Structure formats: structure tokens, C-alpha cells
A protein has these predicted regions:
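Condensing-enzyme catalytic core mediating Claisen C-C bond formation in acyl metabolism
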Residues: 107-172
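Short acidic, glycine/serine/threonine-rich loops at helix termini
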Residues: 7-11, 64, 89-95, 161-166
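Short, intrinsically disordered, charge-balanced linker/junction segments flanking boundaries
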Residues: 1-2, 16, 168-172
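Beta-strand segments within the central parallel beta-sheet cores of soluble alpha/beta enzyme folds
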Residues: 50-55, 76-84, 146-154
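Conserved catalytic cysteine-centered active-site region
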Residues: 4-66, 75, 98-124
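Acidic, glycine-rich active-site loops and adjacent beta-strand->loop/helix elements
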Residues: 2-3, 55-59, 83-88, 153-158
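Fold-level recognition of mixed alpha/beta catalytic cores in primary-metabolism enzymes, strongest
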Residues: 84-87, 93-101
Length: 172
């Protein structure tokens, strides 16, 4: 969703403490989220569409949907798609806390995450990732691949309500 935030924070500390000459020449490329897919492309010789999407918590799902559409449109036979996030840092926690976006159920963390409950009071920040290999159906059949599921569609929407809060009615 954010991409490279821990490195950005660490590099900012280096800059402030040791000056601009101590900044790694890899800082900018490493902070750009599409560099992960670029490195995979170079390492494994992958050719074809290569892009990165940033849509906060929905990034991984939107990447999978976009990959499915590229296959559907005939732009690729196989796509690697998904997302990963590792931004539990002091600055991230402070930012979400200042928005009052984090759950305050600190005494009962096992019940703090309840996104669809009427008594929800925020979210629980976490880290994780998930990657899928998507393949055009006939292409997979031709090579004898075991097919686990079929992606038949995806919906994208914005509720046009608030910068961080969902529309209470669920519209959008």
C-alpha cells in the first residue's frame, strides 16, 4: 500500500544524522514499489506487462484483478500478482493513531479487529503478503497444469464518502 516506508524512515534518520552524502544510491530505486516486480523480471527473465498499483489496503487484490484482466484481454498468458506490506513502524503507528484509526481495544487484542461489527473502533495494523500465479485457462490446460480455481471477475469501487472512513451505509 505504501511501499518502502521502513527504508524511507531509516534513510531520513541517516540524512538528518550524517548528511546527504551518506544516502545510498539505491535509496530512490528501492523506495519505488514497482522495483520488486522489476527485480523479479530481471532475475527470472520474465517478459510482458509489469506494473504496480497503489490502493492502500486493497493493493494486493487490485493487482490480482488487473492481472486477471490483462490475461482476459490477451495481453499475457501468465501473470504473477499480489501484494505485501511491512509498515509497522513508529511513524506509521503515530500517523494512524493521530487519525484515531487504530482500535483502542488494547486489553483484548484478540477481539480488537472487527471490521463489520457495529461496535468497531478502528483497525489493527498488521503485516503480510500474498502472491498468486494466474494463467490463461487454455494455456494452463495445454501444459497439463492442475487448476485450483478460476478468476471470473472483480469489482472496483469508491464510496466517495471520506478520505479514511467508509460510508456507514455501505454504499459505493
Amino acid at each position: 500500500g505504501i511501499g518502502g516506508l521502513p527504508m524511507i524512515e531509516a534513510t531520513d534518520g541517516d540524512y538528518r544524522e550524517r548528511g546527504p552524502r551518506r544516502i545510498s544510491p539505491f535509496f530512490v530505486p528501492a523506495s519505488i514499489i514497482n522495483m520488486i516486480s522489476g527485480h523479479l523480471s530481471i532475475k527470472y527473465g520474465l517478459k510482458g506487462p509489469n506494473l504496480a498499483i497503489v490502493t492502500a489496503c486493497a493493493t494486493g487484490l487490485h493487482c490480482i484483478g488487473a492481472a486477471g484482466r490483462l490475461i482476459e484481454y490477451g495481453d499475457a498468458d501468465v501473470m504473477i500478482a499480489g501484494g505485501a506490506e511491512a509498515t509497522v513502524t513508529p511513524m506509521t503507528m503515530a500517523g494512524f493513531a493521530s487519525m484515531t484509526a487504530l482500535s483502542e481495544r488494547n486489553d483484548t487484542p484478540e477481539t480488537a479487529s472487527r471490521p463489520f461489527d457495529l461496535t468497531r473502533d478502528g483497525f489493527v495494523l498488521g503485516e503480510g503478503g500474498g502472491i498468486l500465479v494466474l494463467e490463461e485457462y487454455e494455456h494452463a490446460k495445454a501444459r497439463g497444469a492442475k487448476i485450483y480455481c478460476e478468476l471470473v471477475g472483480q469489482g472496483l469501487s469508491s464510496d466517495g464518502y471520506h478520505i479514511a472512513a467508509p460510508d456507514p451505509s455501505g454504499a459505493g
